[in-house]
């Protein structure tokens, strides 16, 4: 059984829980260690007791550097009881530093996998700060045997032209984890128009960090005078908002329903909405334009219509499949133009287009988990293995309105 040490930047992150479940379902034995940025009981994993290396906070980069340094100094004490891993996965840049220290502790033959699913704006700066961070990433990742990322645009716009990471990339999309014989295989009720007099519902679920999205959705719901309701669920990045709770509380057509378990609760929460907000203006034009968010796959898996922004990787993804809605502009008028004339027949047609897609477009099942773990196991061989990038779909655009 492959022994994996998974080093995570935030033990409370639901995505860390999902990746750990993926590795375990694939047949690996996982030791999870990392920093904690907050409490989230829903991130607990049966049978996996995480090792806490310290506490960090969103948006406090200097504090995180200090926490990483302290963790590296105490690593022998923290991991002294841990069996030597076959592979170390480092999620995000700061964990690369911890991974290198761990390799020195366990012995210099343990391969490192660098998992990077977001490109922080500081990494893209053209000044001395950006150059220093990219140099640090290049140095810390020079011995990485594999790069895992979630969007082809990250490879196209960052890892190939800017990053010094030379490891072969593996595209591992943010698909919905579905393991045979478990509750995760439930599907939301079929997408249907609301009954007369009831509102259409737009769901914005997951990492809630985009102030502009919050304002845009609030303004739109007011403009439509209750024809549309906004449902928020997940983990708000409170550092990005002046007063998230107060703002939502004062909006007549918006509500926040708290955190949820992923993937266990997805069928229920997506069954309550008609559309998925798959737009993120956080770090606009950079990371937000390149990512393929979890909610894109989650919503489509449960038959809900995704809403994307023109010119983004998400819009390209939808265009290839001729599904979804794409806004021409980031304003209320564009949103009203696309959604305002909505009819039940139009909605039914859009939902039917999604239902015709291959379920494998949205789902990562046990067979996929096992294939991933087998691929990671090849890294234990002495000779580096070439890991090809998953083939990209075509890039033709058909943007604006229903596709």
Swiss-Prot record:
Gene Ontology CC terms, in alphabetical order: cytoplasm
Alphabetic keyword roster: Cytoplasm, Exopolysaccharide synthesis, Glycosyltransferase, Plasmid, Transferase
Localization, UniProt: Cytoplasm
Pathway: Glycan metabolism; exopolysaccharide biosynthesis
GO biological process per UniProt: polysaccharide biosynthetic process
EC number: 2.-.-.-
Function: Essential for succinoglycan (EPS I) synthesis and nodule infection. Glycosyltransferase needed for the addition of the third sugar (glucose), catalyzes the formation of a beta-1,4 linkage between the second and third sugars.
Record's protein name: Succinoglycan biosynthesis protein ExoL
């Amino acid at each position: 059984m492959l022994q994996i040490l998974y080093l995570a930047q935030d033990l409370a992150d639901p995505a860390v829980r999902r990746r750990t479940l993926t590795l375990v379902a694939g047949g690996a034995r996982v030791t999870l260690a990392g920093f904690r940025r907050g409490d989230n009981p829903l991130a607990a994993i049966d049978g996996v007791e995480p090792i806490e290396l310290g506490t960090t906070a969103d948006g406090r980069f200097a504090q995180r550097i200090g926490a990483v340094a302290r963790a590296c100094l105490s690593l022998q004490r923290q991991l002294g009881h841990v069996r030597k891993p076959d592979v170390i996965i480092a999620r995000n840049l700061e964990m690369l530093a911890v991974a290198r220290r761990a390799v020195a502790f366990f012995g210099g033959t343990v391969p490192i996998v660098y998992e990077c699913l977001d490109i922080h704006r500081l990494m893209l700066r053209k000044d001395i700060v950006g150059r220093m961070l990219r140099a640090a990433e290049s140095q810390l990742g020079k011995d990485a045997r594999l790069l895992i990322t979630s969007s082809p645009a990250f490879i196209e716009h960052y890892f190939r032209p800017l990053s010094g990471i030379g490891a072969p990339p593996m595209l591992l999309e943010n698909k919905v984890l579905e393991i045979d014989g478990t509750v995760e295989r439930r599907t939301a009720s079929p997408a249907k128009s609301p009954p007369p007099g009831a509102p259409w519902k737009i769901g914005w679920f997951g990492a809630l960090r985009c102030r502009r999205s919050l304002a845009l959705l609030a303004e739109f719901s007011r403009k439509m005078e209750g024809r549309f309701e906004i449902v928020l669920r997940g983990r708000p990045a409170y550092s990005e908002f002046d007063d998230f709770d107060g703002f939502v509380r004062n909006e007549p057509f918006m509500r926040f329903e708290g955190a949820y378990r992923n993937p266990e609760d997805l069928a229920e929460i997506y069954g309550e909405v008609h559309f998925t907000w798959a737009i993120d203006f956080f770090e606009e034009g950079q990371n937000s334009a390149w990512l393929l968010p979890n909610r894109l796959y989650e919503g489509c898996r449960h038959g809900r219509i995704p809403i994307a922004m023109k010119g983004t990787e998400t819009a390209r993804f939808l265009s290839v499949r001729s599904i979804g809605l794409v806004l021409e502009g980031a304003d209320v008028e564009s949103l009203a133009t696309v959604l305002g004339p909505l009819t039940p027949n139009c909605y039914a047609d859009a939902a039917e287009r999604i239902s015709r897609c291959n379920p494998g477009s949205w789902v990562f099942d046990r067979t996929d988990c096992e294939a991933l773990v087998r691929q990671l196991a090849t890294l234990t061989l002495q000779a580096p293995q070439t890991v090809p990038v998953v083939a990209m779909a075509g890039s033709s655009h058909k943007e604006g309105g229903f596709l």
